[in-house]
């Protein structure tokens, strides 16, 4: 059997299982510390299940899934559903590093609102010159700077979604390494074009996108994935940044550098899995 995914919401998991049953695919639900696991009995059906799962994750509340539950007769099942508050959901889908970085980014953002951007950047921004190179925290701390509410909300949403599942499934140390490496290289890449006047977690976020997506493609048994539709949207967003379509100040070099780092790290980490499949 193959584990397909872990879902925190039992109702959604049951809806997907019922929907796949209408396609003559047998899936099994098992309890998990983070919610429930969905397992597939017939490995030959894995590609079809993954394709349908991508569509499901993009629109899990689509009426066709509820209709499948009615058809299967599981709408009033005796499964022990549990209601979660938003805070419980936030915590259940993230590990200590994911949550700590979120708190740190929010605290720094509030500090920047109180003291001004430059006061905080003077301590945390990418090194301005060689005299600051030995202030090694600067090679990473620039990623925690955000300059607008939309900026920080967008980055933290992706950080929680991608970093949370990576930390839960692969461990805190793996997320820590990717965060540090991508922060350093994305910061270096952006500094070549804009000097030290930049900040934000987006370089790390794009590294996570690349890592989670490619790992899901090459080693789905590791339990992390990013639907191809979301990955395509992220790449289109990256390309749009170069054409200044939205009139926003976007750290394009940091995005590209982060994405490349994430893809390279995922390729390296999954080389044995890909070799086994071949």
Curated annotation (Swiss-Prot):
Listed InterPro entries: GlpG_N_sf (IPR038236), Peptidase_S54_GlpG_N (IPR022732), Peptidase_S54_rhomboid_dom (IPR022764), Rhomboid-like_sf (IPR035952), Rhomboid_protease_GlpG (IPR023662)
Catalytic residues identified in the record: 202 (nucleophile), 255
One cellular-component annotation, GO: plasma membrane
The keyword Disulfide bond appears for this protein: no
GO terms of biological process kind: proteolysis
Subcellular location: Cell inner membrane
EC number: 3.4.21.105
The reaction(s) this protein catalyses: Cleaves type-1 transmembrane domains using a catalytic dyad composed of serine and histidine that are contributed by different transmembrane domains
Pfam families: Rhomboid, Rhomboid_N
Membrane topology: Multi-pass membrane protein
The protein's enzyme class: hydrolase
Chain coiled-coil ranges: none
Transmembrane segments: 94-114, 143-163, 175-195, 196-216, 224-241, 245-267
UniProt KW keywords: Cell inner membrane, Cell membrane, Hydrolase, Membrane, Protease, Serine protease, Transmembrane, Transmembrane helix
GO MF annotation, one: serine-type endopeptidase activity
Primary localization: membrane
Family to which the UniProt record says this protein belongs: Belongs to the peptidase S54 family.
Described function: Rhomboid-type serine protease that catalyzes intramembrane proteolysis.
Protein's name according to its UniProt entry: Rhomboid protease GlpG
């Amino acid at each position: 059997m193959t584990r397909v995914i872990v879902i925190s919401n039992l109702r959604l998991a049951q809806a997907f299982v019922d929907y796949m049953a209408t396609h003559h695919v047998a899936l099994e639900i098992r309890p998990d510390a983070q919610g429930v696991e969905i397992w597939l009995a017939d490995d030959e059906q894995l590609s079809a299940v993954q394709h349908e799962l991508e569509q499901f994750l993009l629109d899990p509340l689509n009426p066709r899934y509820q209709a499948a539950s009615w058809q299967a007769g599981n709408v009033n099942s005796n499964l022990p559903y549990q209601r979660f508050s938003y805070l419980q959901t936030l915590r259940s889908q993230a590990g200590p590093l994911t949550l700590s970085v979120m708190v740190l980014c929010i605290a720094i953002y509030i500090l920047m609102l109180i003291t001004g951007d430059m006061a905080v950047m003077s301590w945390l921004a990418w090194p301005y010159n060689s005299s600051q190179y030995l202030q090694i925290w600067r090679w990473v701390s620039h990623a925690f700077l955000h300059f607008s509410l939309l900026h920080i909300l967008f980055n933290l949403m992706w950080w929680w979604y991608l970093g949370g599942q990576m930390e839960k499934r692969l461990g805190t140390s793996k997320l820590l390494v990717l965060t540090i490496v991508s922060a350093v290289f994305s910061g270096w890449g952006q500094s070549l074009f804009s000097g030290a006047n930049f900040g934000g977690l987006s370089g790390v976020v794009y590294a996570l996108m690349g890592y989670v997506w490619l790992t899901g493609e090459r080693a789905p048994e590791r339990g992390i994935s990013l639907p191809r539709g979301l990955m395509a949207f992220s790449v289109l967003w990256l390309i749009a940044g170069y054409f200044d379509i939205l009139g926003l100040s976007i750290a394009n070099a940091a995005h590209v550098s982060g994405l490349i780092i994430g893809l390279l790290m995922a390729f390296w980490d999954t080389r044995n899995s890909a070799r086994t499949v071949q």
